[in-house]
């Protein structure tokens, strides 16, 4: 006898049946049928989904050859809709083994769901806090598998540095209305560019936030129209076509109470005038009997009189007062940001237990460009500085780009070497000569250079001159060795390098300005160790950092100055920093 090999038979989809709101206990004879583009849609009662929304999630086509890729894509897209439970798909071959009856069974998730969350939080301002949030999710809002999420949140936390404010605690309240569409929501068809297997989504968000923290306090209102899609399981793209944010400082008169170093510098300039009675209106007596500038009116009037020539000071003092006043105006003025950005992310991680992977993220952002183009059409008002105003607020105009790279190497036994690099720059132009505080960069803190507190490092070789130091250029490098100790307790050794600088803006201090390769000598280095406890859902982290190289010091004092626990910086964090 001779062996025979059966030839491979190509199978094609002959019938494609979609069972919407499938109930395993329901009777087939009660189902109704609607046909849409060669798809048979079975349902009972009333069909709650638009046929197109169902068909767009199915990648099998009548008379097309069966491909396992289509099966995988169908599972992914149906799951991505967040409207159905994990689908059940079966294939029934006919007598020739070349024709398939393809059945997709869809069981709906609950129309409504309520989520309540309690989290332990950490931020640049608060050392540790608690956050509460509640959200109501409504699925299939308009019959096209849309998801509406209405959420509210609140938090209270302990200030990371008691000297930042007279208050001990911070608080925050906010809320969002967020609707997601499982397609690109534009007036033209984008399917040829972004097909449905890329899991396209459109998101419209409106939110508000009330923040009470370091004294200035903020209220913000933001609106976002964004689109995201995933060409592969490892690639993700996001476009925020419109990102509008309005930030209002509630207590601008509290500036000099919050920025104590800035106030001290201004008060030093005012020292020669304190004994002259004709300038008594600038000053008051503090609790210790010292004569100081009165906050806010005395300090503001003194600065204005110096700058308009009413009071005579030397050139160095004039520059100091001018820098202080520019900073005060920038940090207390309200911000209006109309931005568009694009982010591209790749992550090679294959699963939650994959300890050997890389991830990179590129982001490009532009703000104010569209409003600038409309200046010849819309008669904007202008302020005294010549800036154009929208709703009485100067709009921000800048371009910004960032690159973030993370690499993890597994070296066995639960040990990991983790590396991160970050670079970012934001360049103001047109209607702005600086970057809004909410879009600028800072250095230090539990997720950055852990040998400095947040906002304490930089810019450049300056020595924490502004209390909350920020700038528009940032470079950062982090290296960490992670290892198990016992059970859920883990340890780490780390080195953090980086700094922030001013560039292409109105900063005049040469020590704060990036001037080329020579400025790389201002990169700070912090080293230290940490303990972590893995609670499964989150990791509690305690790191201690030492200033190994401090660019704010002079000469040999830059290295290992104060390398002891008395001058160490202790950081509490939630989850890994990268």
Model-derived features with residue positions:
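Outer-membrane beta-barrel "beta-signal"
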Residues: 533-537, 564-578
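Periplasmic polypeptide-binding modules associated with outer-membrane biogenesis and secretion
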Residues: 1-121, 153-154, 158, 423-424
């Amino acid at each position: 006898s001779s062996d025979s090999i059966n030839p491979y038979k190509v199978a094609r989809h002959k019938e494609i049946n979609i069972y919407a709101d499938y109930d395993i206990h329901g009777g087939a004879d009660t189902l109704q049928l609607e046909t849409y583009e060669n798809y048979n849609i079975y349902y009972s009662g009333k069909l709650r989904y638009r046929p197109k929304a169902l068909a767009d999630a199915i990648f099998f086509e009548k008379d097309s050859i069966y491909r396992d890729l289509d099966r995988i894509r169908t599972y992914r897209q149906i799951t991505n809709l967040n409207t159905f439970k994990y689908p059940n798909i079966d294939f029934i071959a006919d007598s020739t083994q070349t024709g398939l009856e393809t059945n997709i069974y869809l069981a709906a998730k609950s129309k409504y769901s309520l989520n309540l969350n309690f989290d332990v939080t950490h931020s640049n301002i608060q050392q540790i806090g608690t956050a509460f949030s509640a959200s109501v999710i409504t699925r299939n809002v308009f019959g096209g598998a849309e998801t509406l999420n209405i959420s509210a949140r609140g938090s209270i936390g302990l200030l990371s540095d008691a000297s930042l404010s007279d208050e001990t605690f911070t608080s925050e309240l906010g809320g969002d209305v967020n609707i997601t569409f499982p397609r690109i929501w534009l007036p033209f068809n984008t399917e040829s560019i972004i097909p449905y297997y890329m899991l396209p989504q459109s998101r419209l968000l409106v939110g508000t936030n009330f923040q009470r923290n370091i004294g200035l306090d903020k209220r913000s209102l933001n609106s976002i129209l964004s689109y995201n899609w995933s060409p592969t399981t490892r690639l993700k793209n996001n476009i925020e076509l419109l990102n509008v944010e309005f930030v209002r400082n509630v207590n601008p008169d509290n500036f000099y109470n919050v920025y104590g170093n800035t106030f001290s510098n201004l008060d030093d300039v005012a020292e020669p005038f304190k004994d002259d009675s004709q300038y008594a209106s600038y000053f008051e007596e503090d609790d210790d009997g010292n004569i100081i500038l009165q906050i806010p009116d005395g300090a503001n009037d003194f600065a204005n009189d110096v700058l308009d020539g009413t009071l005579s000071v030397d050139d160095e003092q004039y520059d100091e007062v001018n820098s202080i006043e520019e900073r005060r105006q920038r940090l207390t003025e309200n911000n209006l940001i109309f931005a568009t950005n694009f982010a591209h992310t790749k992550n090679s991680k294959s699963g939650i237990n994959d300890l050997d992977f890389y991830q990179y993220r590129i982001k490009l952002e532009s703000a104010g460009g569209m409003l600038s183009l409309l200046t010849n059409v819309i008669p904007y008002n202008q302020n005294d500085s010549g800036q154009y105003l929208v709703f009485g607020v100067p709009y921000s105009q800048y371009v910004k780009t960032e690159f973030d790279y993370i690499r993890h190497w597994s070296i066995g036994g639960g040990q990991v070497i983790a590396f991160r690099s970050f670079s970012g720059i934001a360049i103001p132009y047109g209607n702005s000569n600086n970057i809004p505080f909410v879009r600028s960069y800072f250095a230090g803190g539990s997720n950055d250079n852990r040998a400095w507190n947040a906002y304490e490092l930089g810019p450049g070789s300056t020595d924490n001159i502004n209390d909350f130091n920020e700038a528009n250029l940032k470079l950062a490098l982090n290296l960490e060795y992670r290892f198990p100790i016992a059970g859920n307790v883990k340890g780490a050794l780390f080195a953090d390098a980086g700094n922030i600088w001013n560039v292409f803006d109105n900063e005049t201090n040469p020590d704060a300005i990036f001037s080329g390769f020579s400025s790389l000598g201002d990169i700070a280095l912090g080293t230290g160790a940490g303990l972590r406890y893995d609670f499964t859902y989150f990791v509690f982290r305690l790191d201690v950092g030492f200033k190994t190289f401090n660019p704010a010091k002079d000469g040999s004092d830059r290295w290992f100055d104060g390398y002891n626990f008395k001058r160490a910086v202790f950081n509490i964090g939630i989850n890994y920093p990268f």
